[in-house]
Amino acid sequence: MLLIDNGIEKMALKLQQRQNLSHIEFLKVRLGMQVVVINTFKAIVTYGLALLLNIFLYTLIVHLTFLTLRTYSHGAHAKTSMLCHVQNIVAFVMLPWLIVQYDISFQFLLILSLLSALIVIKYAPAATKKRPIAPKKVKGLKIKSIIVFVLLMTIACIVPPPYNRFVVYGVLLQSFTLLPIFSIKEEV
């Protein structure tokens, strides 16, 4: 990782010199590069494991569903990059694999989605310390979160098995990040 950090540092310094960036702009550029590299690495590991377990498409469906709802509902983030990485593997690879292995029924997940509906209605959008929400945007984001939830659940009822299970699971997963127990830990 040190080699990658050094490479990012050198590239950011070159950009700073060429573009005459202030120190703050340099730090922003460097942080942006670090985020891209870290997220690329996480994606390679997560989707690589999904490929090895033959659940790539299921992982992708869960991830896309999760991100679609998260766009409007926001929610908790992991405290560290490493914890985020571990949570990604558990949430997007191991749990979908378990859903396949133990043939968790769509009906069971659908019943759990009622809990998700209550969570989204009550807690979305969930602000965090790193991603606060302006008070004037809360009502609009709540309405959009509920609409997206309904659309995703409608899609889950239309798409064939086993894909419908992973749409519902993605919604469940994202709704749990809205719970206040995670916001308190992040000190909203």
UniProtKB/Swiss-Prot annotation:
Coiled coil: none annotated. It is found in: Cell membrane. One of its GO terms (biological process) is proteolysis. It is a multi-pass membrane protein. Keywords: Cell membrane, Hydrolase, Membrane, Protease, Quorum sensing, Transmembrane, Transmembrane helix, Virulence. The chain crosses the membrane at residues 49-69, 104-126, 143-163, 166-186. GO terms for cellular component: plasma membrane. Disulfide bonds: none annotated. Its EC number is 3.4.-.-. One of its GO terms (molecular function) is peptidase activity. Belongs to the AgrB family. Essential for the production of a quorum sensing system signal molecule, the autoinducing peptide (AIP). This quorum sensing system is responsible for the regulation of the expression of virulence factor genes. Involved in the proteolytic processing of AgrD, the precursor of AIP. This is Accessory gene regulator protein B.
